[in-house]
C-alpha cells in the first residue's frame, strides 16, 4: 500500500465545494463542472422558498463545531438554516441570503443532492438571537453538469478516522483521482462544506492511502469521486 499526504483548505465560489488538510474543502468548479444561474426568491408561511423545490425549512441558533471552514472550532449562537432539496436536480453549489429584523445573513452550500437535507451555518459566523425572518434570496445556483457518482465499478473506497484508501479496480491507470465527502448528523448533511482529498495517479490494482483530517468513520459520508483516464 502506498501512502501519500496532501494538505489544503477552502470553501468559496469560483463556483463550488470545499476541501481540508488532506481532506480539504473543495473549491467551486473543482468537481465535475457546473453552470451558474442567479435568481431571486419568495417566502411563504410554510418556510422560505429559494426556487421551485428548494427551500429553507428552519432558521435557528446553532452550537457545536463550526464546520464551514473545516476548522471544527467550537461555536455557539451561530445563525443556521435547514435546507431541503425536493427537486430531481443535484446541485453542485449555491449561495443564498436571508434577511431578518437584525440584518442579512449569507450562506454557501455544496453537493446538495436531489431529495437531500442539509444544515448550513452562516459563512461569516454571524450570531442569531431569534429575530424574525423577513425574506430570502438565492444568489447563485449551479447544478452538476454530470451525475456525481462514487464509481463503485472502478474504485473501492474505504476510510477510517483521518485516512481514506482508494483501490483501482480497473486494468489501466486512473489519473488525478479525488474523493469528496461530507459530515452527517441526524437531520442529513452537516455543513455546506464538501471536503476533497487527492490521490494522484493510481496504477491498475494498486491501493493508495491519503490522510484526510476531517473524515470520521462514524459521521462522514463519501458523496462522489472523480478521475481521468
Task: List the predicted regions and their residue ranges.
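C-terminal motif of bacterial Sec signal peptides marking the signal peptidase cleavage site
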Residues: 17-21
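Bacterial N-terminal signal peptides that target proteins for export
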Residues: 1-10
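Short, solvent-exposed loop/turn segments enriched in Ser/Thr/Gly
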Residues: 73-80, 158-163
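Short acidic, flexible loop segments centered on an aromatic residue
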Residues: 88-103, 172-189
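Intrinsically disordered, low-complexity Pro/Gly/Ser/Thr-rich segments with frequent PxxP/GP/PP motifs
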Residues: 103-129, 189-217
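Asparagine-centered strand-capping/turn motif at beta-strand->loop junctions
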Residues: 82-88, 165-171
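Bacterial lipoprotein signal-peptidase II cleavage site
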Residues: 22-30
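Terminal connector regions
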Residues: 44, 124-163, 214-229
Amino acid at each position: 500500500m502506498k501512502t501519500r499526504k496532501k494538505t489544503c483548505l477552502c470553501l468559496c465560489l469560483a463556483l463550488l465545494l470545499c476541501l481540508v488538510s488532506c481532506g480539504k474543502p473543495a473549491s467551486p468548479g473543482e468537481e465535475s463542472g457546473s453552470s451558474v444561474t442567479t435568481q431571486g426568491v419568495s417566502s411563504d408561511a410554510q418556510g422560505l422558498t429559494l426556487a421551485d423545490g428548494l427551500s429553507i425549512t428552519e432558521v435557528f441558533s446553532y452550537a457545536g463545531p463550526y464546520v464551514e471552514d473545516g476548522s471544527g472550532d467550537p461555536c455557539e449562537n451561530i445563525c443556521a438554516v435547514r435546507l431541503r432539496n425536493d427537486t430531481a436536480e443535484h446541485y453542485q453549489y449555491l449561495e443564498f441570503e436571508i434577511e431578518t429584523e437584525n440584518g442579512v445573513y449569507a450562506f454557501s452550500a455544496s453537493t446538495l443532492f436531489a431529495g437531500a437535507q442539509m444544515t448550513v451555518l452562516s459563512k461569516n459566523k454571524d450570531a442569531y438571537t431569534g429575530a424574525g425572518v423577513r425574506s430570502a434570496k438565492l444568489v447563485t445556483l449551479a447544478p452538476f453538469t454530470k451525475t456525481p457518482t462514487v464509481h463503485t465499478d472502478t474504485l473501492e473506497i474505504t476510510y477510517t478516522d483521518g485516512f481514506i484508501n482508494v483501490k483501482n479496480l480497473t486494468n489501466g491507470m486512473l489519473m488525478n483521482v479525488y474523493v469528496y465527502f461530507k459530515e452527517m448528523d441526524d437531520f442529513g448533511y452537516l455543513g455546506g462544506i464538501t471536503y476533497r482529498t487527492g490521490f494522484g495517479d493510481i496504477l491498475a490494482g494498486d491501493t493508495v492511502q491519503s490522510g484526510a483530517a476531517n473524515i470520521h468513520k462514524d459521521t462522514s459520508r463519501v458523496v462522489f469521486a472523480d478521475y481521468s483516464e
